[in-house]
Swiss-Prot record:
Protein name in the entry: Multifunctional CCA protein
Quaternary structure note: Monomer. Can also form homodimers and oligomers.
Enzyme Commission number: 2.7.7.72, 3.1.3.-, 3.1.4.-
Cofactor binding summary note: Magnesium is required for nucleotidyltransferase activity.
Similarity comment: family membership: Belongs to the tRNA nucleotidyltransferase/poly(A) polymerase family. Bacterial CCA-adding enzyme type 1 subfamily.
Gene: cca
Domain HD: 232-333
Catalytic activity: a tRNA precursor + 2 CTP + ATP = a tRNA with a 3' CCA end + 3 diphosphate; a tRNA with a 3' CCA end + 2 CTP + ATP = a tRNA with a 3' CCACCA end + 3 diphosphate
Signal sequence, renumbered to the chain: none
One Pfam family this sequence matches: PolyA_pol
Taxonomic placement: Bacteria, Pseudomonadati, Pseudomonadota, Betaproteobacteria, Burkholderiales
Keywords, alphabetical: ATP-binding, Hydrolase, Magnesium, Metal-binding, Multifunctional enzyme, Nickel, Nucleotide-binding, Nucleotidyltransferase, RNA repair, RNA-binding, Transferase, tRNA processing
Alphabetized GO MF terms: ATP binding; CCA tRNA nucleotidyltransferase activity; cyclic-nucleotide phosphodiesterase activity; magnesium ion binding; phosphatase activity; tRNA binding
Residues the record lists as binding ATP: G8, R11, R91, R143, R146
Essential cofactor(s): Mg(2+); Ni(2+)
Length: 413
C-alpha cells in the first residue's frame, strides 16, 4: 500500500504558510490491513483510521456518488483498486486536489502529484472546482467562501461561480443543517478577512438564503456625517474586518456582524436616519441565533451589543447614574470580562468607518474606570447594615455605586 499527504497540507506548503492539519490517503489497502498495523478505525460513513503513534487521520482512497439532496446524500466506494487520481477527483477545488507520497519514516518524498493543475491555480490565485461533481455538495459553497476569507487575494473562477449560483437556484443550499452553516460561518469569521467570505456568499446568492438578515444591509444608506462609507453593508464588513485585525474573539466578531441588523428594516421614508434600530436589531437577532443554533456565548454578547452600542458611543455625555444603569442592564457588574468584549465590539463599530479606523475611542477608558469604581462598592457590607429589606438594600447599593462612579470620574450624579 502507498500513503500520500493530500489536500490543504500540500496547498499550504506550496503557499509557504504554516501547515495546521495533515490529511492522509492510503491507496491499495483494506480496513483489515489497516487495523492489523495498529490503526484505529473512527470513520462512520467511510474508513478513516487514527495512526497508532501520531493520532493523525488516514483515510482509505475512495470515490463517491450523489444519492440524495444535501451534504449527507452520498454513497462511498472504497477498495484497494481505487487510485489516488480517483480519490483526488472527488475533491472540491484544484488547489486542494494535490498530493505527495509519504515515506515509511513519515517524510514527504517525490514531486507534487497534481492531476488537475492546482499549482497553476495557486500561482494565479484562483479558486476553481475540480469537476462538475462540485454541485453535489452544498457545503462546498460555504467552504469556498471561508477560503476567500483566509486567502483574501484569491478570486473565484467564473465557471465555478456559475456552478455555485446554479446550486443556490436549485435549492441545494437550503438542505444544509443549521449547525453546519454556523460552523462554516464561525470558521470564516475567525479568518484574516471575514468580509471576503460574505462577498462570495453574496455574489452567488447564498447569503440571502442562509442569513437574509445580513444580506438585507447592502444598499441601505446611513448618514454620511456619521458614516462616510454610507452603505450599511459596507460598514458592517468594515467593522467585522477591524475586529478580525485586532484578533478579537469569535463572540466579538459575531456581534460586529449583527449589531446593525435593524437598519435593514428601517422604513424607506426615514432614511438615512435609523432611529430605534437597536431594538429592531435585537428582535431580528433572536430568531437568527435560534435558527443557526448559535452558541450561548456568541448569542448573549451579540444581543447586548445590538441593544447597547448606541448608548456606549454616547457615554461621554452620561452622568454617573446613567452609567450605573448601563452596567446593570448589561450585567457588567457580574460579568466584567463580557463587558470588556462589549467595549471591543463597540470600538470596532466606531472605527469600522471609511477613514476613521484610527480615530480615538475615549469611551472605552471612561467605561473601564467607571466600572472599576462601581465594582469597588462592598454590597455585602451595605446589606449587613440594612438587614432583610431587599428593596432598601438594592437602592442603597445602587446609590453607593453612583457616588463611586461620580467620584472616580469627577462628574455629577
Amino acid at each position: 500500500m502507498n500513503i500520500y499527504a493530500v489536500g490543504g497540507a500540500i496547498r499550504d506548503e506550496l503557499l509557504g504558510v504554516p501547515v495546521q492539519d495533515r490529511d492522509y490517503v492510503v491507496v491499495g489497502a483494506t480496513p483489515e490491513q489497516m487495523t492489523a498495523q495498529g490503526f484505529r478505525p473512527v470513520g462512520k460513513d467511510f474508513p478513516v483510521f487514527l495512526h497508532p503513534q501520531t493520532q493523525e487521520e488516514y483515510a482509505l482512497a475512495r470515490t463517491e456518488r450523489k444519492t440524495a439532496a444535501g451534504y449527507h446524500g452520498f454513497q462511498f466506494h472504497y477498495a484497494p483498486d481505487v487510485t489516488l487520481d480517483e480519490d483526488l477527483a472527488r475533491r472540491d477545488l484544484t488547489i486542494n486536489a494535490m498530493a505527495r507520497e509519504v515515506s515509511p519514516e513519515g517524510a514527504l518524498v517525490g514531486p507534487v502529484i497534481d492531476p488537475f493543475d492546482g499549482q497553476a491555480d495557486l500561482r494565479a490565485r484562483v479558486f476553481r472546482h475540480v469537476s462538475d461533481a462540485f454541485v453535489e455538495d452544498p457545503v462546498r459553497i460555504l467552504r469556498i467562501a471561508r477560503f476567500a476569507a483566509r486567502f483574501a487575494d484569491f478570486t473565484v473562477a467564473d465557471e465555478t461561480l456559475a456552478l455555485m449560483r446554479r446550486m443556490v437556484d436549485a435549492g441545494e443550499i437550503d438542505a444544509l443543517v443549521p449547525e453546519r452553516v454556523w460552523q462554516e460561518i464561525a470558521r470564516g469569521l475567525m479568518e484574516a478577512k471575514p468580509s471576503r467570505m460574505f462577498a462570495v456568499l453574496r455574489d452567488c446568492g447564498a447569503l440571502a438564503r442562509i442569513v437574509p438578515e445580513v444580506d438585507a444591509l447592502w444598499g441601505v444608506p446611513q448618514r454620511a456625517d456619521y458614516h462616510p462609507e454610507v452603505d450599511t453593508g459596507v460598514h458592517v464588513m468594515m467593522v467585522v474586518d477591524y475586529a478580525a485585525k485586532q484578533g478579537y474573539s469569535l463572540a466579538v466578531r459575531f456581534a460586529a456582524l449583527t449589531h446593525d441588523l435593524g437598519k435593514g428594516t428601517t422604513p424607506a421614508d426615514v432614511l438615512p436616519r435609523h432611529v430605534g434600530h437597536e431594538s429592531r436589531s435585537v428582535e431580528l437577532l433572536k430568531p437568527l441565533c435560534e435558527r443557526l443554533r448559535v452558541p450561548n456565548e456568541s448569542r448573549d454578547l451579540a444581543l447586548v451589543v445590538a441593544r447597547e452600542h448606541g448608548n456606549l458611543h454616547r457615554v461621554m455625555e452620561m452622568g454617573a447614574a446613567a452609567l450605573v444603569r448601563l452596567f446593570e442592564r448589561s450585567d457588567a457588574l457580574r460579568k466584567p470580562a463580557r463587558f470588556a468584549e462589549l467595549l471591543q465590539a463597540c470600538e470596532s463599530d466606531a472605527r469600522g468607518r471609511l477613514g476613521l479606523d484610527a480615530q480615538p475611542y475615549p469611551q472605552a477608558e471612561r467605561l473601564r474606570v467607571a466600572l472599576a469604581a462601581a465594582r469597588s462598592v462592598d454590597a455585602g457590607a451595605i446589606a449587613r447594615g440594612i438587614g432583610n429589606d431587599t428593596e432598601k438594600i438594592k437602592e442603597a447599593v445602587h446609590r453607593a455605586r453612583v457616588q463611586a462612579v461620580a467620584q472616580a470620574l469627577a462628574i455629577g450624579e
